[in-house]
Amino acid sequence: MPVERIGGDAERAIESVLRQEAPFPFELILVSAAPLAIELGTGVRNVIEPNRNPATRRNRAVSEAAGEILAFIDDDAIADVGWLATAVAYFDSHAEALAMGGPDPAPEDSTTAELIAETLLATPLIGSGVACHENRSGIFAIANASDVALVNLFVRKSAFRGFDEAIGYIGEDTSLIVSLLPHVIYHSAVRVFHRRRAFPGPYLRQRWRYRLKTGEMLAQGAAAYSKNLKIKAFLVVGAIAIIAAPITIVPYYVFTLILGVRATRLPVRYWPLLPFAFAAHHATYFAGIVWGWIRAKLG
């Protein structure tokens, strides 16, 4: 678990791991740039890595890990009490599985702004298009590397090839997962609760950075992106919607409202605002991908 500072969400994240109902021993490795102001109990270590590249930090933590299965979680996420036990039980009974992820819904104490962000990510067809953000049910092998996320990821240590430190922040987990397909499993009972960035400002800034990286990876021909039909379909539909905006506005409002209310946990009074939030979300995605692609091509 990469940790910048102790307090708030980080303390809850650490506590959620230490309170796991697991019938086996495990260790928690906290990786930080400087020693953390926390009393380390049994089974907890603080590994120091001054380099703030998240791929470098996680690789450093893995180099110190003694377990056969690596579990990755962020310091703003809370693990379900059976998180470790469920994942390990599946690995024990399925030797072919090399990696696993699961849903990462927002916690129950989320603010209205955070629940708007969750709705934008969780709505099928028009949201993120990512299984773990959509909180899908079931157990299945994923076909798209982005269907699991680093906030909730397990990898057999024997199969771990390292996060690509050249990619750095955003995309380093996708690169690793691609190398492990088709042996990556989505398991809906392997669950963490992940704090969302508040909408609009923090959320849209984060999504902009993510989609810039998507555009850059597309321009570089990375397979996980260039072969992703969802990205291509989104760009085509987005371009058509922009050109035909005068006649698509009303259908867009109705369509996003219907789908959004089916996925949201927001009170009813906020529902009419969802289409406007989706418009900002989609515009950020489209512009970010296009600008990231242009920027990469120019140099």
Located regions from the model:
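Basic/Trp-rich segment in TM-proximal cytosolic loops or flexible interdomain/linker regions
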Residues: 198-248, 266-268
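Membrane-embedded multi-pass helical conduit in multi-pass membrane proteins
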Residues: 231-298
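Short, acidic, metal-binding catalytic loop of nucleotide-sugar glycosyltransferases
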Residues: 12-25
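A recurrent flexible, glycine/aromatic-enriched loop bordering the glycosyltransferase active site
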Residues: 127-154, 166-169, 175, 192-195, ...
